[in-house]
């Protein structure tokens, strides 16, 4: 056991001992060790090189650094504080510079190329052949063959990108937390669901305030904008939400321009036309043009229905208010959409909340994992395993043979110190080892779901249930990885393939058989009445073209900014330019709503992240809709199909080209038709 808990490799992490003042000594020590290991490989005698003492040695050279840094970055996501942020940011340049330097290390690259040309290397097969080829491709794509001056510039670009994208992320979090709305007149909360009202009351009490406190966190925003009758209050909250990342001192506009410029420069140094071509070169889409064409095809297919849906909403509001059909204000969209849904389907999503208590959803998810994938998930108590917050739970996962395949943490509720959204991540990549042993994986799932309130359990919206299933799909991809090479295991796959395991899991949240495993009224234990279930499924594609066009807008904005950077990076009004680029995909409102460009953390909070890759969500929808047809055809609880999905997809990581993995499961290439049918764009 290391004296510094950030350096302790133990499977059960000592979260209570991880203090900000320990970050610097831990990361400095881990960096020194990693640099020493890499330098040793780069200095090996050219006459004594082997695959083991170069490629395999490099694979493990940074293990300690990766684990220590993973603890730091994870804590900053779930338990941010000024001291932790300062400690993280002090170490960020050094960690980023070191990571960027590895593929640009001339001595290292000379030795890897030398080994790759040997008889030993040519004789490699299976995962070791894949690892050698992928490593060589990684180095070439990163610029290993460039002149020294170009390599030095690339290192500097990566370091600056790490710092600027971190600042972008901090601005979004700080702006989100800086705003609150306190309502003291209960009459103004007409229409607000009881759970949201109770949560707002609890939020006010926690701050020592009278009344009801609303924030810019999604569990507060969504019911407020969807149900609150008071338009003035909706406008006030919408205005604040639209300003996230757009006003001083958290204005992200200058950072966006610099991030885009640096990414474009990186692509140019690496002899690529633009950043999209650079990052997509080894993904399924291959080029920015192909990804853009895919999204434009989806746009064309959805355009007619999108226009009709927008007109229908305008006409519905006019009918209800006795006015003329006209553009809605952006703070009216969710409100009148919900009114239209209730009118058309006699269905209010809130009626489902009592059937989705979080604990039952989780239990049902685990039951599903047992039936389909042969897994057993067991919770470990707080007295057995430490976590970073009392709300966090810890679970062990065993497969059908009783093997401990891995464990995970689950952290589902919002806190001011926690970033928004939902995500899966990992701390330890296990799997088989060369000596025949097996190491368990360690992962985590986080979200910002509706929390418990006033003695009631956390009651989720159906969309939140989908999100839980989604993140669990990512988690299974990690926990079930059976690849000996850690960097090729689990979710370390092409970005436009990584969403397949997550998105396919969402399908079970729509099936009556699987819902019956867990969807029970938290007070009566009754299952969802058939009438309500039929209304849920009937309303599934309500305004689905608008949903599709929103995804198209985000993906096109992302791609266009990274393919035509000069048009955006030097633009004083980056918001106006971004809006103009995707105007045809945006719901028409008066006034026009700003885009999410200044709070688009998917593409601007990481040096790469989803940059030029947001299209991956829709790309993977094609894969998941098609793949789920096998379960629909052969049985949604069919354990044989589940075992095949593990064998061909979940266990394989990046052991094989993703298109080939899909073909192994489906017996053919992907078919778009299943997605078009599922989202109501085809019969």
How should these model regions be labeled?
Residues 252-264, 439-445, 483, 652-654:
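Short, hydrophobic/aliphatic alpha-helical segments
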Residues 131-132, 160-163, 170, 174-215, ...:
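Active-site-proximal, well-structured secondary-structure segments within enzyme catalytic domains
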Residues 30-37, 61-64, 68, 262, ...:
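Amphipathic, well-ordered alpha-helical segments in soluble domains
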Residues 1-192, 631:
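N-terminal helix-rich structural modules
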């Amino acid at each position: 056991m290391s004296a510094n808990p950030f350096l302790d490799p133990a499977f059960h992490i000592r979260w209570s001992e991880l203090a900000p003042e320990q970050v610097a000594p831990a990361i400095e020590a881990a960096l020194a060790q990693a640099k020493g290991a890499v330098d040793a490989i780069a200095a090996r005698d050219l006459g004594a090189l082997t695959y083991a003492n170069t490629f395999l040695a490099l694979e493990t050279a940074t293990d300690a650094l990766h684990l220590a840094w993973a603890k730091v970055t994870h804590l900053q996501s779930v338990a941010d504080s000024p001291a932790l942020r300062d400690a993280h940011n002090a170490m960020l340049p050094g960690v980023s510079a070191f990571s960027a330097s590895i593929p640009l290390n001339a001595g290292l690259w000379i030795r890897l190329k030398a080994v790759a040309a040997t008889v030993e290397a040519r004789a490699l097969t299976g995962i070791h052949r894949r690892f050698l080829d992928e490593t060589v491709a990684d180095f070439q794509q990163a610029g290993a063959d460039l002149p020294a001056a170009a390599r030095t510039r690339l290192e500097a670009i990566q370091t600056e990108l790490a710092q600027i994208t971190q600042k972008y992320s901090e601005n979004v979090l700080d702006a989100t937390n800086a705003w609150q709305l306190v309502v003291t007149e209960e009459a103004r909360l007409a229409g607000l669901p009881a759970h949201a009202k109770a949560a707002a009351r609890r939020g006010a009490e926690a701050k020592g305030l009278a009344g009801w406190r609303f924030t810019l966190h999604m569990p507060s925003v969504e019911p407020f904008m969807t149900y609150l009758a008071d338009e003035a209050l909706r406008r006030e909250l919408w205005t604040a939400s639209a300003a996230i990342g757009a006003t001083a001192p958290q204005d992200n506009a200058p950072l966006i321009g610099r991030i885009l410029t640096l990414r474009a420069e990186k692509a140019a140094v690496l002899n690529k036309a633009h950043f999209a071509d650079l990052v997509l070169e080894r993904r399924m889409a291959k080029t920015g043009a192909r990804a853009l064409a895919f999204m434009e095809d989806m746009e064309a297919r959805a355009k007619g229905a999108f226009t009709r849906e927008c007109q229908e909403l305008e006409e519905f509001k006019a009918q209800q208010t006795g006015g003329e059909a006209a553009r809605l204000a952006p703070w009216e969209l969710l409100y009148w959409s919900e009114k239209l849904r209730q009118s058309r389907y006699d269905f209010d999503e809130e009626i489902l909340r009592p059937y989705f208590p979080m604990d039952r959803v989780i239990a049902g998810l685990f039951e599903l994992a047992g039936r389909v994938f042969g897994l057993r998930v067991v919770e470990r108590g707080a007295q057995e395993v430490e976590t970073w917050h009392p709300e966090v739970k810890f679970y062990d996962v065993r497969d059908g043979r009783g093997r401990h395949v891995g464990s995970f943490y689950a952290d589902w509720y919002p806190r001011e110190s926690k970033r928004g959204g939902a995500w899966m991540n990992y701390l330890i990549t296990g799997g088989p080892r060369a000596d025949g042993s097996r190491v368990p994986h360690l992962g985590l799932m986080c979200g910002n779901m509706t929390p418990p309130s006033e003695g009631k359990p956390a009651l989720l919206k159906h969309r939140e249930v989908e999100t839980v299933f989604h993140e669990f799909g990512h988690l299974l991809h990690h926990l079930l990885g059976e690849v000996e090479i850690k960097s090729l295991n689990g979710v370390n796959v092409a970005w436009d393939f990584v969403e397949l395991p997550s998105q396919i899991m969402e399908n079970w949240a729509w099936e009556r058989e699987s819902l019956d495993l867990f969807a029970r009224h938290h007070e009566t234990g009754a299952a969802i009445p058939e009438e309500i279930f039929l209304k849920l499924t009937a309303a599934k594609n309500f305004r689905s073209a608008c949903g599709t066009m929103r995804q198209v807008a985000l993906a096109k904005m992302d791609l266009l900014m990274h393919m035509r950077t000069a048009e955006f990076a030097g633009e004083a009004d980056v918001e106006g330019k971004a809006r103009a680029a995707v105007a045809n995909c945006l719901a028409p409102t008066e006034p026009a709503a700003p885009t999410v460009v200044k709070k688009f953390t998917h593409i601007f909070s990481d040096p790469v992240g989803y940059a030029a890759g947001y299209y991956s969500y829709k790309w993977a929808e094609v894969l998941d809709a098609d793949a789920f047809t096998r379960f629909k055809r052969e049985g949604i609880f069919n354990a044989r199909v589940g075992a095949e999905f593990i064998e061909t997809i979940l266990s394989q990581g990046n052991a094989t080209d993703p298109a080939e993995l899909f073909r192994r499961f489906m017996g053919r290439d992907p078919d778009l038709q299943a997605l078009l049918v599922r989202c109501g764009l085809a019969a």
